[in-house]
UniProtKB/Swiss-Prot annotation:
Disulfide bonds: none
Enzyme class: oxidoreductase
EC number: 1.14.14.1
Protein name: Cytochrome P450 2D1
Binding site residues for heme: 446
Top-level taxon in the UniProt lineage: Eukaryota
Lineage, broadest ranks: Eukaryota, Metazoa, Chordata, Craniata, Vertebrata
Function: Cytochromes P450 are a group of heme-thiolate monooxygenases. In liver microsomes, this enzyme is involved in an NADPH-dependent electron transport pathway. It oxidizes a variety of structurally unrelated compounds, including steroids, fatty acids, and xenobiotics.
GO cellular component: cytoplasm; endoplasmic reticulum membrane; intracellular membrane-bounded organelle; mitochondrion
InterPro entries registered for this protein in UniProt: Cyt_P450, Cyt_P450_CS, Cyt_P450_E_grp-I, Cyt_P450_E_grp-I_CYP2D-like, Cyt_P450_sf, Cytochrome_P450_fam2
Topology in the lipid bilayer: Peripheral membrane protein
Cofactor(s) essential for the protein: heme
Catalytic reaction annotation: an organic molecule + reduced [NADPH--hemoprotein reductase] + O2 = an alcohol + oxidized [NADPH--hemoprotein reductase] + H2O + H(+)
Amino acid sequence: MELLNGTGLWSMAIFTVIFILLVDLMHRRHRWTSRYPPGPVPWPVLGNLLQVDLSNMPYSLYKLQHRYGDVFSLQKGWKPMVIVNRLKAVQEVLVTHGEDTADRPPVPIFKCLGVKPRSQGVILASYGPEWREQRRFSVSTLRTFGMGKKSLEEWVTKEAGHLCDAFTAQAGQSINPKAMLNKALCNVIASLIFARRFEYEDPYLIRMVKLVEESLTEVSGFIPEVLNTFPALLRIPGLADKVFQGQKTFMALLDNLLAENRTTWDPAQPPRNLTDAFLAEVEKAKGNPESSFNDENLRMVVVDLFTAGMVTTATTLTWALLLMILYPDVQRRVQQEIDEVIGQVRCPEMTDQAHMPYTNAVIHEVQRFGDIAPLNLPRFTSCDIEVQDFVIPKGTTLIINLSSVLKDETVWEKPHRFHPEHFLDAQGNFVKHEAFMPFSAGRRACLGEPLARMELFLFFTCLLQRFSFSVPVGQPRPSTHGFFAFPVAPLPYQLCAVVREQGL
């Protein structure tokens, strides 16, 4: 009975607090070495969760970088994290230690969404045989269906024509271009995966685009961070279904499309699309428990392609049009180069890119300035590594701050301004920058980079060949500030598209 009186309750409370503090202290033992990266002192149990602004992580990390240096530490709950900033340190991690930092940390919320040891897709997969198998398949199949070849270029050019038709239908009006751009890029991915496209007013396409956006919103921000930090919360009945409702609905929609594709698949015929090619591999892998070719992983690979291949490029183009209406002189100079190299009748082709240094520089500067994936996806150390004279232990989550590279004051002349001359020499020739890495670097660099580069060039040049874009009369000048999520998109804005006349 003494346990239930005031003295007993106080004793139990004190014992519990001491026990938690001892456990917390043991979880901090990685900090006991003098060569562990410095950082703010974490709170017991919570770590640094309340010391960073999750709604604007890049700015929080920018301030911490200036206080603690290019390599510093944080703690998420009891999980150690190291933030890597600026070109030299980032290259050291992604390239010099590429093999040792190619893994992904465990992410509890993704287990609720169907990620399992043999069904991790490509982007979230642990670094190992399954990841190699799926990356090799994805790259090979994308090449088969035209990545870097004329066939895919024709698909993209045709879709760019449909996009231009959609803009023409609303020429002279005040519109938000985001929805149309998302639909166009969704159709490119749907062509690769299912060999089909949708009309822009098709309710199925509209719903698909909406669900992709919702699913990305659901896995970024404060709530997912809390759930990943304290995964026991995911055991609360019904919580995961409520928090990730859009993601689960999107997967159900994809399941219907995959089932539809399967009913018309003929194994005796050459594959029509990526889904057919994957199903053929599933048949070959039957009886092999070590293979990652299974129906569950097909779904995860398709989710990867839609989320990474659609929204990222559409968001970059949304930034591009925003910057064109804010910098009309840049827009006119791009149009002048288009007129000189391509003209106003012929469709742009990838072979034109080599003869269009200014347009190429503008596209690269849009990617640098837009900075749509500032923190990339986290990495995980598979062994102890040494970076910038610091020792980072095995099992540490690495956050690669690409924003600190793309906007490094020691590299770029005007890091926080839109300045296409960053990619031009004194003679006006296009120049590459080693600090330009919007697709990351190393072993886990974006596998869809060639496709994204093709889409950006063809869509951007097609649009500026056909239209002049401006801020609508009576509308305020849009902001160049982005909204931190994945991907980082500009704040909603309106533009007016006017069909260009010959010679204008």
